[in-house]
Amino acid sequence: MIEGSVRYIDNEPMSSSSKNLFGFHAVGVRIKTAPKSVFEVFYDVQRRDARMRAFTDRARDSGIKLVESDGLRLAKMCGSHGHQGVVARVDALAQVTSLDELLENLEASGENLGVNASVKNPLLLVLDGVTDPHNLGACLRVADGAGAHAVIAPKDHAAGISAIVSKVASGAAETMPYFMVTNLARTLGELKERNIWCIGTSDDAEKTIYDVDLTGPIALVLGAEGEGMRQLTRKTCDQLVSIPMHGAVESLNVSVASGVCLYEALRQRRAV
């Protein structure tokens, strides 16, 4: 049994089922995909630019309750000054509750549950020790874009889903299943029992991401920038690959590295 859960961390006390989203992209995606889950949208009346007018017009056309506010109150609501003048109070969406359930659905249907129809086999992104919410948000965004089925991280020493993560993810935090597991190495072992090939990234690996077959069921495992994967995580992987670096810098940010790996997998799968 693979243990998994989606954890939300809110910056403002609310009911157990509600949370705050902020930023044009995150709120806009929620209004577009699940308007009935949006209780109300607070917006900065001091913003009178074209983008704000277009946003409030779309929200109003969708039947969303609009509440006039100001920048300071919005910052207090979401815990960030990067709200762009928009904060929404929303209901938590129904999520796949466990990684087991997700994988069983994939196995039963044999069809892609992600956004890209060319992805037939499970494509998972595993993050080991990624604690920065901006990095997590960017990883969720690229995982959603590449058609990955889920992102997995350990419960300890990892960022949870917060308003900042949702804002950076630009709506992907609402659509991409994010599972936080008790024991990452054990979870990788259980994925391997399901014939999912676990491929870790390492600067000293002989083969590059472009040298391996990514068309089968795979989990791409990446560590935090600088520290990399923990030793046990590294040992549990079936194979290690590197991302070739041809310039002065030695490594990529974890979200950029995730994008390189996921889109190489997508490229290979589209060619099959």
Language model feature labels by segment:
Residues 1-107, 111, 115:
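N-terminal positively charged helical leader segments and presequences
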Residues 25, 29-36, 43, 47, ...:
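RNA substrate-binding interface of SAM-dependent RNA methyltransferases
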Residues 70, 91, 128, 154-155, ...:
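Short beta->alpha connector loops at strand-helix junctions that form conserved
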Residues 199-249, 253-255:
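Active-site/ligand-binding-proximal alpha/beta "capping" segment
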Residues 28, 144-145, 150, 166-172, ...:
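Structured adenosyl-cofactor binding patch, chiefly the S-adenosyl-L-methionine
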Residues 60, 188-192, 266:
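Surface-exposed amphipathic alpha-helices with a cationic face
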Residues 77-92, 169-173, 177, 181, ...:
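Short basic, glycine-rich beta-strand/loop surfaces that mediate nucleic-acid
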Residues 72-77, 94-96, 184-188, 206-207, ...:
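A short acidic, often aromatic-flanked loop/helix-cap motif at beta-alpha or helix-coil junctions
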